[in-house]
Design a protein with these regions (language model features):
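The feature captures the conserved acid-bearing segment of alpha/beta-hydrolase catalytic domains
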Residues: 101-175
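Short, surface-exposed "cap/lid" segments of acyl-processing enzymes
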Residues: 1-30, 137-149
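Aromatic pocket-lining residues of Rossmann-like dinucleotide-binding sites
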Residues: 94-95
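Conserved acidic catalytic loop of the alpha/beta-hydrolase fold
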Residues: 57-79
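Conserved alpha/beta-hydrolase fold motif
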Residues: 81-82, 102
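C-terminal catalytic histidine-bearing segment of alpha/beta-hydrolase fold enzymes
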Residues: 170-187
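Short glycine/proline- and acidic residue-enriched helix-loop micro-motifs
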Residues: 40-56
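Gly/Ala-rich beta-loop-alpha elbow adjacent to hydrolase catalytic centers
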Residues: 82-91
């Protein structure tokens, strides 16, 4: 086997669909803001990486906590911590001491209500904003990713309701519901 004889398209296609760009590459959902054309497709597929092994969220969270500490030392201010997708899981676990707020863009989930992460965020008084893009409510019913993203968004809404009821400050922004359409998982 040579590298030239392998076809990686099926795996790429799964992410294209899961990230709600379109049903099948190179098709885009109607109204999509994802750029048209071969060059855009090429760049999208280039960002795919192979499985590089286990991912230790605790190590990543501790490292980012050190970065937040350094930022506060250098600036005198806590940071607004922005996460996206799988990075959301890391963000919920970063030590809260040096974080002013969290902005989570389509995190793959939220902390379980009552969990250590939930309690840490609530106790620290960290305000949270969670954003979701388009093609969740209007995505194809026969694609598993559509129901996955609905469940993630519904979980975020439940998290926000309880976080707010417990005295926290969490807002979930569903971009299409405020008139901002055409955004996929990448916004």
């Amino acid at each position: 086997w040579s590298a030239d004889s392998k076809d990686y398209k099926p795996g790429d296609q799964a992410w294209y669909t899961h990230f709600r760009i379109g049903r099948v590459a190179p098709e885009r959902y109607e109204g999509s803001q994802f750029p048209e054309g071969d060059a855009a497709q090429n760049q999208f597929f280039r960002q795919m990486t192979t499985n590089t092994g286990d991912f230790d969220q605790a190590v990543a969270a501790a490292a980012l906590g050190e970065v937040m500490k350094d930022v506060q030392t250098l600036t005198g201010h806590k940071s607004i911590f922005v996460t996206h997708s799988q990075g959301g899981a890391v963000g919920w676990n970063v030590p809260a001491d040096n974080i002013a707020a969290i902005v989570a863009i389509e995190p793959g989930g939220t902390p379980a209500i009552g969990s250590e992460q939930y309690t840490k965020l609530l106790s620290a008084g960290i305000p949270i904003a969670i954003y979701f893009g388009d093609y969740i409510d209007n995505g194809p019913e026969d694609i598993m990713s559509t129901s996955f993203w609905r469940q993630v968004r519904d979980g975020a809404l439940a998290f926000a309701a309880q976080y707010n009821a417990d005295g926290g400050d969490c807002t979930v922004v569903d971009l299409p519901k405020i008139g901002i359409t055409g955004n996929s998982h990448f916004m």
